[in-house]
């Protein structure tokens, strides 16, 4: 199953607000209370929210769930931490890109340095004390500056620091899962995959 490139509003109307997918919002959200929703549908919708918000393929999400199962702690919380510490998501949270697909494109087009080294993998797992900055070219700087101008006034995640001259982001610590701005029940996602196995 490939990455979703279709109409984004369709997914937002179905699943609710997904800030990583698009920064637009639908005019009116349908009332789904009259429809009966099976337990399977509820779990599937939670999984789809996670998948579309972070821009993952089904196979990538399965791999992250398997890694989270092997780690110590709550599988759901570890899964969210793994997804939040991806490079494309960190760029989105810092405001260097307006959406996660835009951040993914920045990384793929080789505009981003992590600790002074060029990284072209959006799935790169950032660690505490990583320094993320645009490449030392005018094009890279302009792309990041335009996104940061749109980002002004929004709250920065508590596990990140942003320095304005030169544009540079610092990962302070592993993300606290209570801070994630997405209404999701991660346990239902883990449950969905445990029933699939």
Curated annotation (Swiss-Prot):
Family annotation (InterPro entries):
Ribosomal_uS4, Ribosomal_uS4_bac-type, Ribosomal_uS4_CS, Ribosomal_uS4_N, S4_RNA-bd, S4_RNA-bd_sf
Keywords from the named record: Plastid, Ribonucleoprotein, Ribosomal protein, RNA-binding, rRNA-binding
Entry keyword GTP-binding: no
Q: What are the annotated GO cellular component locations?
A: plastid; small ribosomal subunit
User: Looking at the keywords, is NAD present?
Assistant: no
Q: Which residues form the S4 RNA-binding domain?
A: 85-161
GO MF terms here are:
rRNA binding; structural constituent of ribosome
Cited Pfam families: Ribosomal_S4, S4
Localization recorded for this chain is: Plastid
Q: Which GO terms describe its biological process?
A: ribosomal small subunit biogenesis; translation
Q: Which PANTHER family match?
A: 30S 40S RIBOSOMAL PROTEIN (PTHR11831), SMALL RIBOSOMAL SUBUNIT PROTEIN US4M (PTHR11831:SF4)
Q: How does it assemble?
A: Part of the 30S ribosomal subunit. Contacts protein S5. The interaction surface between S4 and S5 is involved in control of translational fidelity.
What NCBIfam families does the database record attribute to this sequence?
PRK05327.1, rpsD_bact
Family assignment? Answer: Belongs to the universal ribosomal protein uS4 family.
Q: What does this protein do?
A: One of the primary rRNA binding proteins, it binds directly to 16S rRNA where it nucleates assembly of the body of the 30S subunit.
Q: What is this protein called?
A: Small ribosomal subunit protein uS4c
Can you name the source organism? Cuscuta obtusiflora (Peruvian dodder)
The gene that this protein is the product of is rps4
């Amino acid at each position: 199953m490939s990455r979703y490139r279709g109409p984004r509003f369709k997914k937002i109307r179905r699943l609710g607000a997904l800030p990583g997918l698009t920064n637009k919002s639908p005019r009116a959200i349908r009332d789904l209370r009259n429809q009966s929703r099976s337990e399977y549908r509820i779990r599937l919708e939670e999984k789809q929210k996670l998948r579309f918000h972070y821009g993952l393929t089904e196979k990538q999400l399965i791999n992250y769930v398997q890694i989270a199962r092997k780690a110590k702690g709550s599988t759901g919380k570890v899964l969210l931490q793994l997804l939040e510490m991806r490079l494309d998501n960190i760029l989105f949270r810092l405001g260097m890109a307006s959406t996660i697909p835009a951040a993914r494109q920045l990384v793929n087009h080789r505009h981003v340095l992590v600790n002074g080294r060029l990284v072209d993998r959006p799935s790169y797992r950032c660690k505490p004390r990583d320094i993320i900055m645009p490449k030392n070219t005018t094009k890279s700087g302009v792309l990041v500056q335009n996104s940061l101008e749109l980002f002004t006034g929004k709250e920065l995640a508590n596990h990140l620091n942003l320095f304005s001259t030169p544009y540079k982001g610092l990962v302070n610590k592993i993300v606290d899962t209570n801070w994630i701005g997405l209404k999701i029940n991660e346990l239902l996602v883990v449950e969905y995959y445990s029933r699939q196995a």
